[in-house]
């Protein structure tokens, strides 16, 4: 009887682990800007588009915009280690949550770009 209970517990544990793993993977997939933003972007405007952004997910969002619209101008500030490859949008990695000199300079670049 002990062996049977151990097998049942092991089987239940494996099924629960599989369900939790699938839920986790689905949550990660649906939170990926490449999967969500791309679906909701309108057609690219015919006029100049400038993308600006800040935050940990902003570089991936910029990458998604360029995936759909092609090369765009812009600057995005993200946390160190969160940079993504973009064709035209400049991705600047800076400190978070406490700003560093790189973040301050990047913010100044955004202000200059918008003028």
Please name every model-derived segment.
Residues 5-115:
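Non-transmembrane, aqueous-exposed alpha-helical and coiled segments at domain scale
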């Amino acid at each position: 009887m002990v062996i049977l209970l151990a097998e049942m517990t092991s089987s239940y544990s494996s099924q629960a682990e599989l369900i939790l793993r699938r839920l986790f993977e689905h949550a990660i997939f649906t939170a990926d800007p490449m999967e969500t933003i791309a679906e909701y972007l309108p057609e690219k405007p015919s006029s100049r588009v400038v993308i600006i952004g800040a935050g940990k997910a902003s570089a991936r969002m910029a990458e998604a915009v360029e995936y759909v619209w092609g090369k765009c101008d812009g600057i995005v500030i993200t946390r160190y280690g969160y940079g993504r490859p973009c064709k035209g949008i400049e991705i600047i990695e800076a400190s978070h949550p406490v700003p560093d000199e790189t973040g301050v300079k990047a913010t100044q670049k955004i202000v200059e770009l918008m003028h």
